[in-house]
């Protein structure tokens, strides 16, 4: 039983979601099982899975296995000793994207600190295979910090994704508690170097709120991201995946998220999604640059012809 100091906050009404289990959703779920693929949508218990899979024709594949070498205190993904790399995974991901006619695909990965290249070669090959089979699908990558291995980052950026997404997750003060194996400054450097390697590829990051940060700390984090040339920001409510994870300290209202979005845009971000259910990949198909949007339009025209 929780003590007064550990009391669990009641989830507000605005966090209730409408389930959408149409053909897109059920078809994609069957495809993932058939191809033996993982999605962060399922593994991380994302609240938007029904909207993205069911209505938007977008999905987030999680590659390099389903077991992460880290144990961040906010994350529902399994941790432990990972399996051997599956070298056929890039082709299976590419086939699945093609079969589902996905408009936008996000490719994320568990952290593989056990691998010399942090998994970057298989990751880059996945991007290339998806691009070969799906020239009109926009591709976003969401890697770990790869242990600060910038040769691995260079390998990954050479695959030319449409967006590089790497999440700061929380404010500087809370980072050691929330994700002990990462550092705030390494995340900023990873984002800065990504832009230096491929200046025309938009960079993106995400902040979870509700972990005990102050508004001033959120604004400081926005400033740090802009100082490292980050283009796109998403801000969402932290939700506790299980009793083992960090507790929610505050539920922000939709009005508060609206204010955060306005501040972010005033600070110079090109795009900001902010809301209680917003996650890193939420409405990601809208956040690509104009060149990538033209690819999406060509794909839609082909699909409807």
Curated annotation (Swiss-Prot):
One Gene Ontology cellular component annotation held by this UniProt entry: cytoplasm
What GO annotations for molecular function exist for this entry?
4 iron, 4 sulfur cluster binding; lipoate synthase activity; metal ion binding
**Annotated cofactor note:** Binds 2 [4Fe-4S] clusters per subunit. One cluster is coordinated with 3 cysteines and an exchangeable S-adenosyl-L-methionine.
Organism ancestry: Bacteria, Bacillati, Bacillota, Bacilli, Bacillales
By which gene is this protein encoded?
Answer: lipA
Q: What is this protein called?
A: Lipoyl synthase
Question: In what pathway does it function?
Answer: Protein modification; protein lipoylation via endogenous pathway; protein N(6)-(lipoyl)lysine from octanoyl-[acyl-carrier-protein]
| Reaction(s) catalysed (UniProt annotation) | [[Fe-S] cluster scaffold protein carrying a second [4Fe-4S](2+) cluster] + N(6)-octanoyl-L-lysyl-[protein] + 2 oxidized [2Fe-2S]-[ferredoxin] + 2 S-adenosyl-L-methionine + 4 H(+) = [[Fe-S] cluster scaffold protein] + N(6)-[(R)-dihydrolipoyl]-L-lysyl-[protein] + 4 Fe(3+) + 2 hydrogen sulfide + 2 5'-deoxyadenosine + 2 L-methionine + 2 reduced [2Fe-2S]-[ferredoxin]
What species does this protein belong to?
Staphylococcus aureus (strain bovine RF122 / ET3-1)
Q: Which HAMAP family match?
A: Lipoyl_synth (MF_00206)
């Amino acid at each position: 039983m929780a003590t007064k100091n550990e009391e669990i906050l009641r989830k507000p009404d605005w966090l209730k979601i409408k389930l959408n289990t149409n053909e897109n959703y059920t078809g994609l779920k069957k495809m993932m099982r058939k191809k033996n693929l993982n999605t962060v949508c399922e593994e991380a218990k994302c609240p938007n899975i029904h909207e993205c899979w069911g209505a938007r024709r977008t999905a987030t594949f999680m590659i390099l296995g389903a077991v992460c070498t880290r144990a961040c205190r906010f994350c529902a993904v399994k941790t432990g000793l990972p399996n051997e790399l599956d070298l056929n995974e890039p082709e299976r991901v590419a086939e699945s994207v093609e079969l589902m006619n996905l408009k936008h695909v996000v490719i994320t990965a568990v952290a593989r600190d056990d691998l010399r290249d942090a998994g970057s070669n298989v990751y880059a090959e996945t991007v290339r295979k998806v691009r070969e089979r799906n020239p009109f699908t926009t591709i976003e990558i969401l890697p770990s910090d790869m242990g600060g291995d910038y040769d691995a980052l260079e390998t990954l950026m050479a695959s030319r994704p449409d967006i590089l997404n790497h999440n700061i997750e929380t404010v500087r003060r809370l980072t050691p508690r929330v994700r002990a194996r990462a550092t705030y400054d390494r995340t900023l450097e990873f984002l800065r170097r990504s832009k230096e390697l491929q200046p025309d590829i938009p960079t993106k990051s995400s902040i979870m709120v509700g972990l005990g940060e102050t508004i001033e700390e959120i604004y400081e984090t926005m400033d740090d991201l802009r100082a490292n040339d980050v283009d796109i920001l998403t801000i969402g409510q932290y939700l506790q995946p299980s009793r083992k994870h960090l507790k929610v300290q505050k539920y922000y209202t939709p009005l508060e998220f609206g204010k955060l979005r306005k501040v972010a845009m005033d600070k110079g971000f090109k795009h900001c999604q902010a809301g209680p259910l917003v996650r890193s990949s939420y409405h990601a198909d809208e956040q690509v640059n104009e060149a990538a949007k033209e690819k999406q339009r060509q794909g839609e025209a082909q699909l409807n012809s």
